[in-house]
């Protein structure tokens, strides 16, 4: 499972997030997406931990918590469903 962390301060770093989530267990990975054109952080992150129970505890404790002056939104990440092709090239039944 992957955790979505939204409403992040643009000052937050991978090390900052690892430190916060380490209180709930071992952090496997942190991803901080950046804007392709500006290189600026986009204000959200994805965190993976070793065990689902650890992730559940982190979500319960951190969702709505204030951190770096922002109220965090923390929940289970949803799989991306768009395939970025639009309708062109999709097989359709006629």
From Swiss-Prot:
Residues 78-94 have a biased composition (Basic and acidic residues). It comes from the Bacteria. PANTHER family: HETEROGENEOUS NUCLEAR RIBONUCLEOPROTEIN 87F-RELATED. SUPFAM superfamilies: RNA-binding domain, RBD. Keywords: RNA-binding. Residues 73-94 are annotated as: Disordered. This is Putative RNA-binding protein RbpD. The keyword Iron does not apply. InterPro entries: Nucleotide-bd_a/b_plait_sf, RBD_domain_sf, RRM_dom, SLIRP/GR-RBP-like. Residues 2-79 form the RRM domain. GO terms for molecular function: RNA binding.
